[in-house]
Every structure is written in C-alpha cells, then in structure tokens.
Amino acid sequence: MSSNGDSVKYDTNFDREGYSTDSSNECPNQIDDPLNGIPNSQNSENFQLYSRNNNANELHETFPTTIPIAQQVHLSSFRNSGMVNSNSRSIGPDGSIYSIQPFDRALLQRNFIPNDEMTSNMSFVQMLNSANYDQIEPAFYQNMPGIGNSFMMQSILNPNPNDQEIDNPISDNSTYVLVQGDSNIPTNPQSNPINPTYVSLDLNDCRSNMFEYPSQTGHQYPDINGNGPRLLHCKQELSYPQTNISPFDYRLSRSMQSNTPLSSYKLSLPEIKTISNDWIKGSQNVNFNQNQLLRSTNVSDYTLIKNLPQNLPNPNQTDSIYSSSINENNQPIRNYDSPNPDREDDSEIHENPNPHDTSSVENNDNENSSSGDIGKKRKRRVLFSKKQILELERHFRQKKYLSAPEREHLANLIGLSPTQVKIWFQNHRYKMKRAHHEKALEMGNLAVNRRLNQSMFNDSKSHLPGNFELGINNSFYNSNLALGNLSLNPAVNLMGRIPGMSSMLPTYPNGSQSYFNNINQATLTGSNSSWGV
C-alpha cells in the first residue's frame, strides 16, 4: 500500500488460492488491508479505510485506486456493521453510473449474488482509467441483519458504443465485481462489531471468496498467511462476457479458466457514489457509462480475434444488380444482368412452337456419352408455351432489361422462375444484337457491291467515242487516248441510239489505252473516211 496525502494505492499480489505470495509472517507493506482496527459505532456515519500501518486513525474518504484485476483483490473498504436509518442517502436516484449489488449471507446463506449480466465464461479483460471514489454510506435493510456493510460492485456497461475509441472497445454488458463486504451478525449502532465478514472476488479463478477477520479484541494485525482471515471459496462461478460492439468485435478465442491468470491486466476504480436502503430495495442493477477504457496488450495466453467489418452483399436485397447461384462444385456464381454480351449466361432456354407438346424436352445425355465428351453433359432445354412467349416478347418490347422485382413479377405471372425469365431476356437480347449485326453486314455488302458496280460501269463508259450520246463524260477518253478530234460516223452514232444495237459497239478492257494503241491506224482511216487523224 502506498499512501500519498489522502490517497491509497493498492498493489496486491495474491496467488490463485487467495493467499499472499509473501512468505513473511506479516502482510507486506504494499498490501492494504483494513486489519489495523475496526471503526466503532461513533464512526458509523463515515466510510473509512484503514491502512496496514499502526495508525488506526488514518482515514481515506477519497482515493485513486489501481487493482490487478486478475489477482486476488483485497479492497477492504469497509466499516463496522450496525443498523442505520432506512432513510439513508441513496445511490443513483437519477440513474447513477454504478450498479451496487448487496447480499445477505445471514438470510441467503451465500456470500455473493451475481448480476444478470454474468454468464459462465470470462471472455475479455479491460482497464479503466484512474478515478476518485466518493465516500460510501452504508445501507441496511431495516430490522434485518446488516447487508452490504461495505461492498462495491462495478458494472462496466456502455450503452453507447459509438462514443468509444476503435482501439479501446468495451463490452456493453460486461460486469466486474471487485469487492463486497458484509456483516452476518446484526448489531445496533451502539454495540461493538463482532466478527465482521468481508467478501472479495478472486478474478484469477473467477470465484468469489469469503474471509472472516477476527474480532477487535483478537489479533489486531492478523497474518494473512497464518493466523489471519481464512479464505473460503464460494460455489458461485463468475464470468464477464464480451459482446459484439461496433466498429470492431474483440473476443478471446477461449474462455478464462481457473488456472490461467492474467496478471498483466489492471483495473482502476472510477468514482462511486452513496448508496441507501431505498435504492437497494428498488433496484439491483444500475448501468453507467464509462468511455475511457484501455486494453492491455499482453495476451500471450490467448488468441485475439479481430473481426473486421465486411461489406458483403445482402442476399435478401431484391433490387440487387446481380443474383447468386451455386454451381456443381458448390462455388458461388454471379450472373450479371448487364448489357455486356460477354457476361451473358450460357444457359439455354428455347421456345416451344407447340404449347401443348410437353414431351419434347431434350435430354441428350446418351448422345453426349457416345460423342467422346463423356464428362460433359448437355443442358436440358426449357421449352416455353406460346402464351409464355407472347408475354415475354411483349415485355421485351417494352423494356430490354428487367430488374429483379420485375423479373420475379413476370415469372409469377406466366408460371416461370425468375432465372428462366432472366435467361430468356439474355438470349433474346443476344439474338436481337446478332440479327442487327447480320443485317448491318448485309447492308454493308450491298453498299460495297453497289459501289463496285458503279465503278466498273463508269470505267467501261470512259472508252466510248467522245460524242457518243449516252449522257456521259468523255474527258477520260479524250485525255488518255490523245487521238485528236475524232468524229463518229453517223451510222455509228445511230447504232448507239437504236435499241439492241449498242451491244455491237466495241468493249475495251481495263488496259484500254494500250489496247487501242495496238489497233492499226490505217484500218481506222480506211474503214471510214469520216474519221480524221
């Protein structure tokens, strides 16, 4: 125990059996135990703490305290037993921050009553920042044995997890029981206390302990290891669950066992207010909001699991842009209903031209086994009735892409599954795109052929005589042949005007210039005198 002014610091160090690890015959100085005196009835209105030294008058009404939570806690904050007025000051009538849990060993024959938040396993240990205690007024049931002569029970309950830091999560229903003191012998305020009983909690093995101090006339400074108080483990198992909180979920991978100490964890006690008989009768649990928790990093005996939040799709969300399915290997497949033809589902759904023919469902498993691909099976074709096809086509003309609710509505309307409707729309969009593509190719081919024919026709016309009346331009002929001013014979001119006679005109190949140059010039001159050179 270290004392500084009006403060006391507890650095207790007990083994799992609840006894001091110091082998000396007296309690070590760093251990604070109120064994140096029991306050009498004249001090009944004051909550008193007595240190280990011989100064019985050393009083600490407020003190910052640090307690090893995983070790035996002897926070013997107590006062003498005795009856007090039932009109004592109450704790938390306005919703105080603490839950004080009294007990009555004389009536209930047990020394501890756990809170409802306690379960069977201890899953996480945390730390509180230091705080000061106010003095605690005693509270007793009127005309009954004294209960809660001195007791403190701290419930770490955080109703607003969003206020806490990410690295310092706390449970929203964890409960840490530190100390409960009791007097099992009813006395009046004027009598001397006799064998007051105190209860502490051995967080090392998650069991509460009861020990009795001798009377004031006995050992004034008893030895914890020898003639001092005898520790008795109660049968009530305690635990402190850690529940899921946001933004992260921390929990230990295995429970706290009785032989697994966590000596590295420490707990500082926040402020405690006064209690009274009225509050004890009316409530057993009062929540408080403690946002300043520090988590120890020494968890070598455990595996700390940190579950990060994952933004996974909600399978129940009807307006999702995709639907999930399971393939033959139990692996999820996402079928996107998007205009991208590369993501089209390869399932086959075919139309049945005969709505009354239901026997035409094709299942060619035997044919596939004989074709060489034994491991591959052809998918069963789904045949639609004429009524279903008409309804599907009508909706397709209205809307090329259906949302999930629209698919489900249409499927219920025509007696199909939403997947069948989706695949039909995918196949129909693919067929429409393919038809448009083929039509575009066909139109392109026609345009190309038209341009080729026009080019060939223009090339053939360019080899005719200059004044051949076909309404064409003879500049190509005049510029390339360079034959001078050739005038056609009237007979030749007439041949171009008479139907059926134009086929008798000479036809020139592509190399018309070389071909024409090879013609005998004399032949041209002699054949018709009207041709001039």
From Swiss-Prot:
GO terms for molecular function: DNA-binding transcription factor activity, RNA polymerase II-specific; RNA polymerase II cis-regulatory region sequence-specific DNA binding. GO terms for biological process: cell differentiation. Signal peptide: none annotated. One of its GO terms (cellular component) is nucleus. Residues 308-317, 360-371 have a biased composition (Low complexity). Residues 8-19 have a biased composition (Basic and acidic residues). Residues 1-28, 308-378 are annotated as: Disordered. Keywords: Developmental protein, DNA-binding, Homeobox, Nucleus. Residues 318-333 have a biased composition (Polar residues). InterPro entries: HD, Homeobox_CS, Homeobox_NK-like, Homeodomain-like_sf. Transmembrane segments: none annotated. Residues 377-436 bind DNA. It is found in: Nucleus. Intestine and unidentified peripheral parenchymal cells. Slightly higher levels in the cephalic region compared to other body regions. Belongs to the NK-2 homeobox family. This protein might be involved in determination and/or differentiation of nerve cells in the continuous replacement of neurons in the cephalic region. This is Homeobox protein DTH-1. It comes from Girardia tigrina. The lineage of its organism: Eukaryota, Metazoa, Spiralia, Lophotrochozoa, Platyhelminthes. The gene is DTH-1.
